Amino acid sequence: MVFSSNVFLFLFLPVFLGLYYLSGERYRNLLLLIASYVFYAWWRVDFLLLFAGVTVFNYWIGLRIGAAGVRTRAAQRWLILGVVVDLCVLGYFKYANFGVDSLNEIITSFGMQPFVLTHILLPIGISFYTFESISYIIDVYRGDTPATHNLIDFAAFVAIFPHLIAGPVLRFKDLVDQFNHRTHTVDKFAEGCTRFMQGFVKKVFIADTLAALADHCFALQNPTTGDAWLGALAYTAQLYFDFSGYSDMAIGLGLMMGFRFMENFNQPYISQSITEFWRRWHISLSTWLRDYLYISLGGNRGSTFQTYRNLFLTMLLGGLWHGANFTYIIWGAWHGMWLAIERALGVNAAPRVLNPLKWVITFLLVVIGWVIFRAENLQVAWRMYEAMFSFGTWQLSELNRANLTGLQVGTLVLAYLVLAFFGLRQFYNQPLQTKAPKAAANSDEVAADGPASAQPRAPREAAGDPAAIAYSPSGALVYQPSWLSQLPVLATRLALLLLFAASVLKLSAQSYSPFLYFQF
């Protein structure tokens, strides 16, 4: 089951929320656990046993570490056991096929018989719940969180369905208080609904439309330069709107249940370096890699070479986390290489006048990386790169023109306009003015009894009227009814509601809605 499906929207979610708010507070975590297991079992019931087994094992390891004491030798042995078992489970189900296939390519080239391994099905979400389990037992070992004795709460944390299939990567220490007690308000629920609708529109209205365009460009056997760049740019936008859309939906669903999850994206395509990009893209994963892998490797505590090595290895393994394919390994190495280069060159200390150039270079490096991330294999990636940098004809191939629709082109343009608008708004955003301009500050209408009160005082006749206070360009006070000041907000919400309704209709009508996270 996925969020962008009719069965989730019209059956699972309303039934769950109804039961959730009808139940008492003490039963809500148990209900959340049961609902999350139903959500997961909708895909495969048999893998639910593996899921539950990993959960119970890490709960037990956490208790053993907690009993042994913070950072003791005994606790370290329990931690090593837990991490090794978790990685073995992840390695077997996610990487065994890849490892055997790679080994067979080598040994068959020497005339040897290949190994035979029955195809192993990848349990959905295993990368997320394995990483979250590992972070929990490491935090218990470090003393960052106490070992929980409540199996229901821990199992609900690992399985909580909003984040289960596409993130964010959560940490028990950040949510333990919310599992013990969380507030439920109408405002928080409404905020969650708004956030969910935003993500749904991103995924269904934009990402799904761009998916068909990107898929077609990457499938061309003889792409032109125009075809290749069109496909790369389409996938760049598709991946962001798909992934951030799922994160928005997860955060929104969490708010509906009283949780606040960490933000996962922060306008990554306005980044002026690869270093900044990883502070804005998939934040929950990048911070996990920093806190539990990069620091464990030594971070920047060793020599300069060791620091660069640790950066490179962290991103290499981060690439492998995304999928069992050489394309992901190379993509991770690509980012690791540029992180090391930027650190060596001191890119972040470059003059501000170079910021536009830094943005262009960073965006191109990210787009180039997405090509091999998207490619099914190295051959497809090479074909795309060859077309992109041969600088042949920029005209689209006849086959591509025949399949290209006006909706796809319009959605691609819309996607980049949205990225540009919100990116520039954040880039140039200044804090909202909370004090009167200088011209008004000297007028008789401003109280003079201290800095904190340097706000305009409403006339007597306005007392009791919930009017919004604004300033004209000259600094003169302008009083307007509260409903007028709310018009932009109301218009935005109405537009979002209409887009959400259109996206639901589109979902019902379309037969293609790719799920990008089956490899995670």
Swiss-Prot record:
GO terms for cellular component: plasma membrane. PANTHER family: ACYLTRANSFERASE, TEICHOIC ACID D-ALANYLTRANSFERASE. This is Probable alginate O-acetylase AlgI. Pathway: Glycan biosynthesis; alginate biosynthesis. It comes from Pseudomonas aeruginosa (strain ATCC 15692 / DSM 22644 / CIP 104116 / JCM 14847 / LMG 12228 / 1C / PRS 101 / PAO1). It is a multi-pass membrane protein. It is found in: Cell inner membrane. Its EC number is 2.3.1.-. Its main location: membrane. One of its GO terms (biological process) is alginic acid biosynthetic process. Keywords: Acyltransferase, Alginate biosynthesis, Cell inner membrane, Cell membrane, Membrane, Transferase, Transmembrane, Transmembrane helix.
